[in-house]
């Protein structure tokens, strides 16, 4: 995991959550999908992906779309449905499940109109449950179908125990092993 505030990292290791050694062929998992491209447009509850996207209707459902640059930069959401004919993905806020976008930069207003300057990244959606704390947010970097890094966007607060981390990607064939660490109530 990587913390953007101090640059500390935790990359994949050869150790499973239970401390046992990993099969080197499973490091990073298998079958994870990702896509980076320029949007055609979008609104408060949708994004129209690039006309070069070749995904079927189920490939991206449940995954996260992040606006990485241009109009809407910093916004992110869970993809709830995708029409490969129109390239329209419907999105929901990860914070409460309602239609729309969240923003990594809470002080920035959500842009309700996306345009041809909007670039996006579709990636596995990572979320945390339990542990007594809240607010931890992590992005997963995918290369060649494997998760190669986790980036801590927000380390959260109030964690008294290690939370459970879930990686959502309907394309995954072998789950990526990972280990979560907390220190001083936050992801470390």
Where are these regions (language model features)?
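Short, solvent-exposed secondary-structure boundary/capping segments
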Residues: 83-99, 148-151
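Exposed loop/turn and edge beta-strand positions of beta-sandwich/beta-sheet ligand-binding modules
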Residues: 73
